[in-house]
């Protein structure tokens, strides 16, 4: 079993304590065993749909889907893939908002297992620590690579950054298109969903909140 980083352990514990962890049931399967089991189930699903798995276009599809689930789009279920995080002392004494806008994210709706496609915007006010900017993107992408609901995803990113930075002063906003709305059901191709999660002064100070929300425009 791969040992988890201290950062991964801290973030997971914080999410569990706040009831924000993705619903999970522990099992003893390793990655290869998961892929083999998923491949078998996917083969059965495709056969049930009447698809001919002897056709060269379909023959490898169960294997491809299993590999994609475990190694890619659901890799965020495995904390051994939690990004290596660089947090450094705030020697420059930065005390103004740092904002990273338009972080691309692709997730999967946990209700229908279809795509959520959107952008995340992250801001924080440094206290004792600052984080490498690319690490913010990687943390967003880690939590997106799970079956998700957008509300939980937003809060998970917030709490992870609060935990790693040692400050409540973090704000997250996500704007996303849900293909469970766009490609099925109501078939609405133009609507999107916005969720926001605010901590610390972003929640308690109207001017700081307005600065963050204003930074989302344009």
From Swiss-Prot:
Among InterPro entries, the record links this protein to: GTP-CH-I_C/QueF, GTP-CH-I_N, GTP_CycHdrlase_I, GTP_CycHdrlase_I_CS, GTP_CycHdrlase_I_dom
EC number of this enzyme: 3.5.4.16
Reaction it catalyzes: GTP + H2O = 7,8-dihydroneopterin 3'-triphosphate + formate + H(+)
Q: What enzyme category does the UniProt record give?
A: hydrolase
| Gene Ontology molecular function: any one | GTP cyclohydrolase I activity
Biological process, per Gene Ontology: one-carbon metabolic process; tetrahydrobiopterin biosynthetic process; tetrahydrofolate biosynthetic process
Which UniProt keywords are given for this protein, alphabetically ordered? GTP-binding, Hydrolase, Metal-binding, Nucleotide-binding, One-carbon metabolism, Zinc
Q: In which pathway does it act?
A: Cofactor biosynthesis; 7,8-dihydroneopterin triphosphate biosynthesis; 7,8-dihydroneopterin triphosphate from GTP: step 1/1
Cited SUPFAM superfamilies:
Tetrahydrobiopterin biosynthesis enzymes-like (SSF55620)
Residue sites binding Zn(2+) per the record: 109, 112, 180
Going by the entry's taxonomy, the superkingdom of the source organism is recorded as Bacteria
GO CC annotations, alphabetized: cytoplasm
What Pfam families does the entry give? GTP_cyclohydroI
Q: How does it assemble?
A: Toroid-shaped homodecamer, composed of two pentamers of five dimers.
**Entry's family note:** Belongs to the GTP cyclohydrolase I family.
Provide the protein name: GTP cyclohydrolase 1
Recorded source organism is Aeromonas salmonicida (strain A449)
């Amino acid at each position: 079993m791969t040992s988890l980083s201290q950062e991964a352990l801290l973030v997971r514990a914080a999410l569990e304590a706040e009831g924000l962890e993705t619903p999970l049931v522990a099992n003893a399967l390793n990655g290869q065993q998961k892929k083999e089991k998923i491949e078998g189930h996917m083969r059965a699903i495709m056969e049930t749909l009447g698809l001919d798995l002897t056709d060269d276009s379909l023959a490898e599809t169960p294997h491809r889907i299993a590999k994609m689930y475990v190694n890619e789009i659901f890799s965020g279920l495995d904390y051994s893939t939690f990004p290596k995080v660089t947090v450094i002392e705030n020697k420059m004494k930065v005390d103004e908002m740092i904002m990273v806008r338009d972080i691309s994210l692709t997730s999967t709706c946990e209700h229908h297992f279809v795509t959520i496609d959107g952008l995340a915007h992250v801001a924080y006010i440094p206290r004792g620590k600052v984080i490498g900017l690319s690490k913010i993107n990687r943390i967003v992408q880690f939590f997106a690579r799970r079956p998700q609901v957008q509300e939980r995803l937003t809060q998970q990113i917030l709490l992870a950054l609060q935990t790693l930075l040692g400050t409540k002063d973090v704000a997250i906003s996500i704007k996303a298109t849900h293909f469970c709305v766009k490609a099925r059901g109501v078939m609405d191709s133009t609507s999107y969903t916005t969720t926001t999660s605010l901590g610390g002064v972003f929640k308690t100070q109207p001017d700081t909140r307005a600065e963050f929300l204003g930074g989302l425009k344009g």
